[in-house]
Regions:
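Metallo-beta-lactamase
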Residues: 40, 106-107, 112, 129, ...
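Aromatic/hydrophobic pocket-lining residues that form the small-molecule binding cavity
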Residues: 48, 76-77, 188-192
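Short Gly/Pro-enriched turn/cap motifs at secondary-structure boundaries
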Residues: 21-23, 113, 119-121, 141-145
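Active-site HxH/HxHxD metal-binding segment of metal-dependent hydrolases
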Residues: 42, 50-135, 161-162, 221-224
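Conserved S/T- and glycine-rich ATP-binding loop of Class I adenylate-forming
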Residues: 33, 70, 142
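Conserved beta-strand hairpin/beta-sheet module of binuclear metal-dependent hydrolase folds
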Residues: 6-62, 151-166
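Hydrophobic residues in well-ordered beta-strands that form the structural core
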Residues: 46, 91-93, 165-166, 207
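Conserved beta-strand segments of alpha/beta enzyme cores
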Residues: 17-19, 90, 122, 136-138, ...
C-alpha cells in the first residue's frame, strides 16, 4: 500500500470544516467532518480508505464519534479495523452492505486491501439522521454501485450550500460502476433521478474518488443523462 497521502482542508460551505485525504493505491478520498474547530470537537470519518495512521494523524485533537461506510468495497474500508480499534468510534453502514463488512473480505489485489471483520454498530436506512454536535446529516440510500450504497447529505444553513458525501454513487462527470456484484444500472438510474436530483444545484459533492463537484454541474451531464 502506498503510504503517502494528500491532505486538503477546506471550509467549502463557509462553516463546516472538512478534511480530505486522498490515499491508497486507488486514490480514494477519505473525509473528516467536524462540528467545530476547538479541541475535542466531535467528528466523523466517511470511507476510511488507505492508512489508519494517516487518518489518525489528520484527526489530531478531534473526537471521532462515527465512521460512516458508504458501501462495502475493500478500497473504501482498508483502514476501518485499525481506526475503529484505536478510537472506539461507532461504525455506520446500510444493512444490505453490513453483512460483508461484518464478515470481512480477502484482498482483491493482494494483502494490502484485505479487510478484517468489523461490527457495524448502527445500521442506517434511507431517511435516517446522524447527529454530530449541532450538525444533522441525512442518510440517502442510493443503490446501483452496491445494494446498500448510501450518500450522506448535510443540508445547507445560514445561506451556505449543503454537502453531499457521495461515495461511489456520483463522481465528477461519471457514476460508479454498475457491473460489479450487487450493481444495477436500473437502481443507479433511480438513485440519481429520485434522490440526488432532488438536491439543490449548489450542493457540494464530495465523491469517493477524484475532485469535488456540485449537483448543478452533474445534473445534465450525469444525473439526467444516465
Amino acid at each position: 500500500m502506498r503510504a503517502d497521502c494528500k491532505r486538503v482542508v477546506t471550509d467549502a460551505n463557509g462553516c463546516v470544516p472538512v478534511s480530505i485525504l486522498t490515499i491508497g493505491m486507488m486514490d480514494n478520498n477519505c473525509f473528516i467532518v467536524s462540528a467545530g474547530r476547538e479541541e475535542g470537537a466531535p467528528a466523523l470519518v466517511v470511507d476510511p480508505a488507505g492508512d489508519a495512521d494517516a487518518i489518525l494523524k489528520a484527526l489530531g485533537w478531534l473526537d471521532l464519534k462515527y465512521i460512516v461506510c458508504t458501501h462495502d468495497h475493500n478500497d473504501h474500508l482498508v483502514a476501518l479495523p485499525a481506526l475503529q480499534k484505536a478510537t472506539g468510534a461507532k461504525v455506520v453502514a446500510h444493512p444490505l452492505d453490513s453483512k460483508i463488512i461484518e464478515s470481512g473480505q480477502p484482498g482483491y489485489f493482494g494483502d494490502w486491501d484485505a479487510v478484517a471483520p468489523v461490527y457495524v454498530d448502527r445500521k442506517v436506512k434511507d431517511g435516517d439522521s446522524i447527529k454530530l454536535g449541532s450538525l444533522e446529516f441525512k442518510v440517502l440510500h442510493t443503490p446501483g454501485h452496491t445494494k446498500g450504497g448510501i450518500c450522506l447529505y448535510l443540508p445547507g444553513f445560514d445561506g451556505k450550500p449543503g454537502l453531499l458525501f457521495s461515495g461511489d454513487t456520483l463522481f465528477r462527470g461519471a457514476t460508479g460502476r454498475v457491473d460489479f456484484e450487487g450493481g444495477s444500472a436500473r437502481e443507479m438510474r433511480a438513485s440519481l433521478r429520485n434522490k440526488l436530483s432532488a438536491l439543490p444545484d449548489a450542493t457540494i459533492v464530495y465523491p469517493g474518488h477524484e475532485g469535488l463537484t456540485t449537483i448543478g454541474m452533474e445534473r445534465r451531464r450525469v444525473i439526467e443523462a444516465f
